[in-house]
Amino acid sequence: MEVYIDKECWDKIINYAKAAYHTEKCEIGGMSVVTQDKDGDWLIQEPVILKQEIGGTTCDLDKEELAKYYTQMAIKYNKINFRFCWWHSHHTMSAFWSGTDLSSIDEYGEGESDLSFALVVNLKEEYKCRVSVWKPVEIHQDVELNI
């Protein structure tokens, strides 16, 4: 299984991160849809930012906006095998999984999700990409992102 993101979507996430840092000196986060192709590989696409509270080292997505987003994407992608990717920035820090990040990732395992993706980027365009399998057993693996 490979994870891909096209250059346009990658640049969009990086530009969101740069804009948040240059205007607010803050992190920013958002969501993307991840679709599976016929070979079993996954493509991160359509990165968006949602209403959120941002700070120097945190970004908290609005739960109501997140629920609306999940519903809209479920309708749009109802005939395609898809999952979600939570992405966020660490601006001038390294790309790593903080304790807060790991807690946020774990929230996906509390619901019905069997598989989820997470991506953290920084202004140097470094990243960590994690695939989390929740069922039948819990496994987390940081993987290479093919840009």
What does each model-found stretch correspond to?
Residues 1-85, 92-147:
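Conserved beta-strand-loop surface patch within small alpha/beta domains used
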